[in-house]
Amino acid sequence: MSNKGQLLQEPFLNTLRREHVPVSIYLVNGIKLQGQIESFDQYVVLLRNTVTQMVFKHAISTIVPGRAVHFSTAEPADANSNNG
């Protein structure tokens, strides 16, 4: 995975994990999983509901938080935003 992707994924997933935000995870095959993110690494997300499921990131289409979340990448503004 590119470094740019990790700059967004890690703070987003960490916020969801730390704040115990309920999430819906949609897989590429259309299946919807629900629970709370327990942990994650470069390749998988551990999703806890009645049991803990290991979900491979390559199978994930979308992660939808159950409420609004605010997170920071702690990086300066994107260079592309200075196109004016």
Curated annotation (Swiss-Prot):
SUPFAM superfamilies: Sm-like ribonucleoproteins
The Sm domain, residue ranges: 10-69
Domain of life: Bacteria
Gene3D superfamilies named in the record: 2.30.30.100
GO cellular component, one term: cytosol
Coiled coil regions in record: none
Disulfide bond positions: none
GO molecular function list: RNA binding
Single GO biological process annotation from the record: regulation of DNA-templated transcription
Keywords of this entry: RNA-binding, Stress response
InterPro entries, sorted: Hfq, LSM_dom_sf, Sm
Known role: RNA chaperone that binds small regulatory RNA (sRNAs) and mRNAs to facilitate mRNA translational regulation in response to envelope stress, environmental stress and changes in metabolite concentrations. Also binds with high specificity to tRNAs.
Self-association state and partner proteins as the record states: Homohexamer.
PANTHER family (UniProt xref): RNA-BINDING PROTEIN HFQ
Family: Belongs to the Hfq family.
Protein name: RNA-binding protein Hfq
Species, as recorded: Verminephrobacter eiseniae (strain EF01-2)
The gene coding this protein: hfq
